């Protein structure tokens, strides 16, 4: 299978988010890459599901709380940007203050 660098990056994000969701379900606190991957995948999947940009941003900003992440991780992530594929094309989605 021949994948573009962008497709390889998406696969890595989805793989890490799968691990992160499982760790979160076990009650483990997430580190920086795990938290970013969950926020990113939530945004990408919301877009793919046909949700509006506003709904995607809102959902992605509510998927994690400070209790879900290791100390200091929330402060390291002031925003997350991801190019998501919506039903009418791709858009850059910026999730501000994604961990509250």
From Swiss-Prot:
One GO cellular-component annotation of the UniProt record comes to: cytoplasm
Annotated compartments: Cytoplasm
Principal localization? cytoplasm
**What reaction gets catalysed by this protein?**
urea + 2 H2O + H(+) = hydrogencarbonate + 2 NH4(+)
Q: Which Pfam families match?
A: Urease_gamma
Which InterPro entries does this UniProt record tie to the protein? Answer: Urease_gamma, Urease_gamma/gamma-beta_su, Urease_gamma_sf, Urease_subunit
Q: What is its EC number?
A: 3.5.1.5
**Recorded GO terms, molecular function?**
nickel cation binding; urease activity
UniProt keyword annotations, A-Z: Cytoplasm, Hydrolase
Q: What class of enzyme is it?
A: hydrolase
Q: Which GO terms describe its biological process?
A: urea catabolic process
The biological pathway it contributes to is:
Nitrogen metabolism; urea degradation; CO(2) and NH(3) from urea (urease route): step 1/1
Q: Which NCBIfam families match?
A: PRK13241.1, urease_gam
User: Which family does this protein fall into?
Assistant: Belongs to the urease gamma subunit family.
Could you describe the subunit structure of this protein?
A: Heterotrimer of UreA (gamma), UreB (beta) and UreC (alpha) subunits. Three heterotrimers associate to form the active enzyme.
Q: What is this protein called?
A: Urease subunit gamma
């Amino acid at each position: 299978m021949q994948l573009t660098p962008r497709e390889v990056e998406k696969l890595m994000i989805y793989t890490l988010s799968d691990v992160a969701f499982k760790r979160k379900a076990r009650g483990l606190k997430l580190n920086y890459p795990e938290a970013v991957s969950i926020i990113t995948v939530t945004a990408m999947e919301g877009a793919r599901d046909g949700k509006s940009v506003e709904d995607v941003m809102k959902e992605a900003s509510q998927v994690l709380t400070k209790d879900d992440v290791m100390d200091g991780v929330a402060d390291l992530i002031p925003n997350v940007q991801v190019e998501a594929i919506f039903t009418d094309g791709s858009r850059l989605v910026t999730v501000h203050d994604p961990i509250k």
